[in-house]
Design a protein with these regions (language model features):
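Conserved ABC transporter NBD signature motif
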Residues: 79-91, 375-383, 392
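The feature captures the beta-strand-to-loop junction immediately N-terminal to the Walker
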Residues: 56-58, 352-354
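Conserved ABC ATPase "signature" region
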Residues: 137-155, 428-446
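Conserved beta-strand-loop-alpha-helix hinge in the C-terminal portion
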Residues: 238-265, 530-557
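Conserved ABC ATPase signature
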Residues: 159-163, 167, 450-454, 458
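Catalytic Walker B motif of ABC-type/P-loop ATPase nucleotide-binding domains
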Residues: 184-187, 475-478
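Helix-to-loop junction immediately C-terminal to a conserved catalytic motif
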Residues: 71, 367
């Protein structure tokens, strides 16, 4: 039976059936207006009241499309061929408008900052309530509990733009909570957050779960979803696995093939011939000790073995030198505070730190996008302020966190050719360089394609290709794996590693601990505009006090290794260490 559109969400639940399910999705299929391939293919699931479901899958698997079907954004706002049905609390959504469903299914989008636009926190939380016609007294009754629930009480008069990344995400969640929805959908809620911000958001998710809310969390990473009641694994618009995390997350090859990062603890257990699912470091430790009783936890201090020093650094002078640089934006607080840093030939340096610590600001000084208030930057021993833009571009290149801020040409080939042509290179040299770098990043077959029709991972690689065509000696990448699925992350880092081996110095700004552990040779930790640490990766991860001060959580496998009194940066390292001792 078709339900006629309602004029108010007040009436939403009136005709709802008595049901134990918050969400029932039946045979959902959808193809976007201009799409040639189905984004969803006969997807169905039921969510019990108070259940937390995680949805995993590669970019383009259909996760966000499925989420938009749950609150009528599809097919109401985003048109295409839609079939199937969704019921919320036993009431089918057929014919309802997005505004009718908003108070029942709250959604926090992947780009949570796009949801924030008011002048202060209180107005932000009030906005959605105003739109459904709630009176002021009711709004005031809901405002404080919503802010308390997310830890933002007392922030009512703060400008949202002044909040940290984690605080902004919590504000977006508070705006949804104020509507008292049955279901909250969070689409990759921690994508742009530092480890501390991620911990804040998932602590909040745990709190909401304890309150009995039904939660659907979309994630690339498996670590936090292990605590879900069930997980759904999607590939190419279809559900390929559904069940408790302990069942789904032991199929490591299927996860990897589906663009999902397999849990590192499960990988270590597999490499040791133990297998199974570890929900925590404690679980993994217990499983290893049961399998290998001779292994005992050691209280000894962790040996700080030096990493191998690349041959290129021996006796070399710095490619880039930052000398006592301080900087603040107009009328703003100090972002860099007398910071110094040297980048050597052959370096593979990871710059880490909390959101707002000054990492990107530092990188922009190196490539000349910003000028220091005090101090100076040298490129190959020359003061960068005296260099022309073209001279800087030949020495140091910068790839933005969002490749769409860098891409503008009509075709992939013209995007890559733009720099060499500006340098007045001969046409045959331009062609040679374009072919060379597009082949290196795996995009040669896309040379005539529209860049904006490429996937996020492909656009990221195109941005790298466009600066590589100038043959810089130093390449700086700002969060190069943000928004990419696991396969894309590995492909991007394999490319970056190969560039480093070819002689290009690499600087990666990142929040991802396993990426630092497995790829970088050196780490610089920035906190409040100052450099707290600059040294080898093993030394960094061995310093528990430093990591705690910086709110930087090491990979789980590193935490597990510490229980045995050793240091391991990957599942393979830990497995090898155990096998040597049993």
């Amino acid at each position: 039976m078709k339900v006629e559109p309602q004029s108010s969400v007040e009436n939403f639940g009136a005709a709802g059936a008595d049901t134990d399910y918050s969400v029932e999705a039946v045979d959902l299929s959808f193809t976007y207006q201009d799409g040639t391939r189905a984004a969803l293919r006969a997807v169905g699931f039921k969510q019990a009241r108070g259940e937390m479901i995680g949805i995993m899958g590669a970019s383009g698997a259909g996760k966000s499309t499925l989420a938009k079907c749950l609150n009528r954004i599809i097919p109401e706002f985003e048109g295409g061929r839609f079939s199937g049905s969704v019921s919320i609390g036993g009431r089918r959504l057929d014919g309802l408008r997005v505004c009718d469903v908003a108070a029942e299914v709250g959604m926090v989008f992947q780009d949570f900052e796009a949801q924030l636009f008011s002048t202060n926190v209180a107005h932000e939380v009030a906005f959605a309530m105003e739109q459904i016609g709630m009176d002021r007294a009711a709004m005031n009754q809901r405002m404080t509990p919503a802010l308390e629930a997310v830890g933002l009480r007392g922030f009512e008069h703060r400008d949202p733009t002044s909040l940290s990344g984690g605080e902004k995400q919590r504000l977006a969640i508070a705006s949804v909570l104020a509507l008292s929805p049955r279901v909250i959908v969070l689409d990759e809620p921690t994508t742009d957050l530092d480890p501390e911000g991620k911990a804040e958001v998932f602590a909040l998710i745990s709190h909401l779960r304890e309150r009995g809310l039904s939660l659907i969390v979309i994630e690339h990473e498996t670590e936090e979803l292990r605590r879900a009641d069930r997980v759904i694994l999607m590939r190419e618009g279809a559900v390929i696995s559904i069940g408790p995390p302990a069942e789904v997350m032991i199929n490591l090859e299927l996860l990897e093939q589906s663009g999902v990062h397999p849990p590192s603890l499960n990988r270590a257990l597999e490499m040791l011939g133990i297998g199974g699912h570890a929900e925590s470091v404690d679980d993994a430790y217990a499983a290893i000790v049961r399998a290998y009783p001779r292994l005992e936890s050691s209280a000894q201090s962790i040996a700080r073995e030096p990493d191998a020093v690349p041959a290129q650094t021996t006796g070399a002078s710095a490619l880039a030198t930052v000398e006592n640089v301080s900087f603040n934006y107009t009328a703003g607080p100090q972002v860099l505070d007398s910071i110094s840093l040297a980048i050597m030939p052959g370096d593979f340096l990871a710059i880490v730190g909390q959101n707002g610590s000054g990492k990107t600001t530092l990188a922009k000084h190196i490539v000349g996008l910003l000028k220091p208030v005090t101090g100076r930057v040298l490129l190959d021993g020359r003061d960068r302020s005296a260099l022309r833009a073209a001279e800087t571009a030949r020495e140091a290149a910068y790839v933005f966190q969002n490749p769409d801020h860098q891409i503008f040409a009509a075709t992939v080939w013209y995007e890559v050719a733009f720099g060499p042509r500006n340098f007045k290179l001969a046409p045959d040299e331009v062609e040679r360089r374009c072919v060379e770098v597009l082949d290196a990043v795996g995009l040669l077959s896309e040379r005539e394609s529209d860049p904006f029709l490429l996937s996020k991972g492909e656009r990221q690689r195109l941005a790298v290709a466009s600066v590589l065509a100038l043959r810089p000696r130093l390449l700086i990448l700002d969060e190069p794996t943000t928004g990419l699925d696991y396969r894309e992350q590995r492909r991007m880092m394999a490319l970056v590693t190969e560039l480093n081996r070819s002689g290009i110095a690499i600087v990666v700004i990142t929040h991802t601990p396993w990426l630092v552990a497995e790829y970088a040779q050196r780490v610089a930790l920035i906190r409040k505009g100052r450099k707290l640490f600059d040294g080898r990766v093993r030394e960094f991860f061995a310093d528990e006090g430093l990591l705690k001060t910086a709110s930087f959580r090491p990979p789980e496998v590193t935490r597990l290794a510490r229980r045995f009194g050793t240091l391991a940066l990957s599942p393979r390292e830990l497995a090898d260490w155990v096998k040597e001792r049993v």
